[in-house]
Regions:
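Conserved active-site "lid/cap" helical segment
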Residues: 1-41, 45-55, 59, 66, ...
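Flexible glycine-/small-residue-enriched beta->alpha junction loops
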Residues: 89-142
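Conserved catalytic cysteine-centered active-site region
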Residues: 9, 37-93, 125-133, 194-199
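Active-site-proximal alpha-helical scaffold in enzymes
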Residues: 72-101, 139-169
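Short glycine-/acidic-enriched loop or helix-start segments at secondary-structure transitions
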Residues: 47-48, 106-109, 180
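N-terminal extracellular/periplasmic Venus flytrap/periplasmic-binding protein-like
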Residues: 7-17, 25, 148-200
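Beta-strand segments within the central parallel beta-sheet cores of soluble alpha/beta enzyme folds
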Residues: 31-39, 66-71, 96-101, 148-155, ...
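Fold-independent oxyanion-binding glycine-rich loops
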Residues: 40-41, 59, 99-101, 107, ...
C-alpha cells in the first residue's frame, strides 16, 4: 500500500531479500543453483526486464545463476514454486528456487496495458470480472452472507494475531531491511487483532 512500510523499496530489492536470507540461514555456494523462478503479474517498469534475474544479481548470487519470470496472474508465485520443483522432479535440475514478487504500490495492476482487462471484446470471451465483483458473485451463489463472512474474517484476524504472538511464523518470515540495513518490516502489518465483525 502507498503508505505501507515497504513503499520506499524497489520491487527488485524486495525480490532479492528472500534470496539473500536463504543464504544467510543456510550458507551455500550460489553457483550450485540451477535456476531461480519468480512469478510476477505486471512485469513492466520497475518489475520489468526479468525481475527474477535482477533479484539474483541484487542478492549477490554468482552472475552465472540463471533465472526466469513467469506470469499466471494471481497464481504466479505459486506457479513459480511448482515450476521450480517440477524441474527437480523431472531431473532437469538439482537445486532450484521458486518465489514471486508484486509491488502494486509502485507498479499498479493494469500498468502493463494488457488487453484482457481493458478490451471489452476480448474480456467477453472469458467473462472477465475484477476480484471484488467475482468474490461477491461467488458468495451469493454459494449462500455466504455478509454477516457470516465478516464473522469469519474477524475470527481469522484474531487467530493470525495469536499465531504471530506465539512465534509460529518465525521460520517463514524474513525481516525486510533497506540497503543501509534499517529494518522496515518484521511482521505482517495487515493483521488487525482488534478488528470485529461490526468494524469490517
Amino acid at each position: 500500500k502507498p503508505e505501507g512500510s515497504l513503499h520506499e523499496l524497489t520491487p527488485v530489492w524486495l525480490a532479492s531479500r528472500p534470496l539473500a536470507a536463504l543464504r544467510e540461514r543456510h550458507p551455500f555456494d550460489s553457483r550450485a543453483v540451477d535456476d531461480v523462478v519468480y512469478g510476477c503479474v505486471v512485469p513492466v517498469g520497475e518489475q520489468g526486464g526479468n525481475i527474477a534475474r535482477m533479484a539474483v544479481l541484487q542478492a549477490d548470487y554468482d552472475p552465472c545463476v540463471p533465472a526466469l519470470q513467469i506470469n499466471r496472474y494471481c497464481g504466479s508465485g505459486l506457479e513459480a514454486v511448482a515450476f521450480a520443483a517440477a524441474k527437480v522432479m523431472a531431473g532437469q535440475a538439482d537445486l532450484t528456487i521458486g518465489g514471486g514478487v508484486e509491488m502494486m504500490s509502485r507498479v499498479p495492476m493494469g500498468s502493463d496495458g494488457g488487453a484482457w482487462a481493458q478490451d471489452p471484446q476480448l474480456a467477453s470471451k472469458t467473462s472477465f470480472v475484477m476480484q471484488g465483483i467475482s468474490a461477491d458473485l461467488l458468495a451469493s451463489l454459494r449462500g455466504h452472507s455478509r454477516a457470516d463472512l465478516d464473522a469469519y474474517s474477524a475470527h481469522s484476524h484474531r487467530r493470525a494475531a495469536r499465531a504471530w504472538a506465539e512465534g509460529r511464523f518465525g521460520r517463514s518470515v524474513v525481516p525486510v531491511k533497506d540497503f543501509l540495513g534499517l529494518e522496515l518490516l518484521a511482521h505482517d502489518e495487515t493483521i488487525r487483532a482488534d478488528t470485529s465483525a461490526a468494524s469490517l
